[in-house]
Amino acid sequence: MAKENICIIYGGKSAEHDVSILTAQNVLNAINKDDYQVDIIYITNDGAWKKKDDITENVEDVDSLRLEEVEEGEISNLLTNSSSGQPYAAVFPLLHGPNGEDGTIQGLFEVLDLPYVGNGVLAASSTMDKLVMKQLFAHRGLPQLPYVSFLRSEYEKYQSNILKLVKDKLEFPVFVKPANLGSSVGISKCNNEEELKSGIEEAFQFDRKLVIEQGIEAREIEVAVLGNDYPETTQPGEVVKDVAFYDYKSKYLDGKVQLSIPAELDSEVQTTLRNMAAEAFKATDCSGLLRADFFVTEDNQIFINETNAMPGFTQYSMYPSLWENMGLSYADLITKLIELAKEKHVEKQKNKYKID
């Protein structure tokens, strides 16, 4: 049987650029190259698109994926011309953060009518924006912790009023987050007003909108979701930290985080978490994959924290580990995601685009 053509896209104009490259290395080394002919497209920090065809060997040096010697190409040509001359069975965007995980590149795929792995424009954009995501969860009745959100322009004009609002509505510690970033980039844990001001300034370096959330003493529990219209969920896993805050460095660089899979939880709590993860998936009209993150208190109160529409596939990642625990290997998970992308594209072709 002939190999299917797959294009993996990574890098991107985002603060999570390096995380994306790590994810690409992991996927390239795990994908079944007997079944797929794999081309890669690297998007530089400046937005240039560079392509390398027919990757047959594992990638040992992650920096080799930066494709510094490759010339920039025309985007539409790169996406529509595979190394074999056949159309791509699917493109696999491994882009994290703005300009990749937020619906922008998904819109490009839709315009070009390409099958692609993961969430569509609506789901990607709504799960990327923490405020919109929280509003959709509230509409679905999913329990959340109190929060405050505001724009950079509002803070510049009404700083004292906003700080008062935060102190009136929330108690220290609080977490300050850019609304449109993941991997804990730009996030600060703040224990007092001075740290709050500093955290706000830090977050506004990455986004024009931020969310400040109530801190809580709780376990951090995550559930993986996979599917299209009828999603499946995993047993929950737990993030066990050697640090006070699970930030970018501890996630990807230091290895100061351990994953406990499955998490030690009552069966009733596990069932509730899995049901809530599926509800979160449906609330934002997801397809392909999603990771849902929760807080579980000592007395088993459950709060949804956020969802991640493109969880990383690095060696520290929870998402593939949760499916491994369910009996689905990393390579088979990648294959399943490609099949879901093709399924979603076939479903889309049933739509009429003209009136007879």
UniProtKB/Swiss-Prot annotation:
The keyword Nucleus does not apply. GO terms for biological process: cell wall organization; peptidoglycan biosynthetic process; regulation of cell shape. Binds 2 magnesium or manganese ions per subunit. ATP binds at residues 167-222. Its EC number is 6.3.2.4. InterPro entries: ATP-grasp, ATP_grasp_subdomain_1, D-Ala_lig_Van_CS, D_ala_D_ala, Dala_Dala_lig_C, Dala_Dala_lig_N, PreATP-grasp_dom_sf. Mg(2+) 1 binds at D293, E306. Mg(2+) 2 binds at E306, N308. It is found in: Cytoplasm. It is an enzyme of class 6 (ligase). It catalyses: 2 D-alanine + ATP = D-alanyl-D-alanine + ADP + phosphate + H(+). One of its GO terms (molecular function) is D-alanine-D-alanine ligase activity. Pathway: Cell wall biogenesis; peptidoglycan biosynthesis. GO terms for cellular component: cytosol. It holds the Pfam family Dala_Dala_lig_N. It comes from the Bacteria. Residues 134-339 form the ATP-grasp domain. Its cofactor is Mg(2+); Mn(2+). Keywords: ATP-binding, Cell shape, Cell wall biogenesis/degradation, Cytoplasm, Ligase, Magnesium, Manganese, Metal-binding, Nucleotide-binding, Peptidoglycan synthesis. The keyword Metal-binding applies. HAMAP family: Dala_Dala_lig (MF_00047). Cell wall formation. Belongs to the D-alanine--D-alanine ligase family. NCBIfam families: D_ala_D_alaTIGR (TIGR01205), PRK01966.1-2 (NF002526), PRK01966.1-4 (NF002528). This is D-alanine--D-alanine ligase. The gene is ddl.
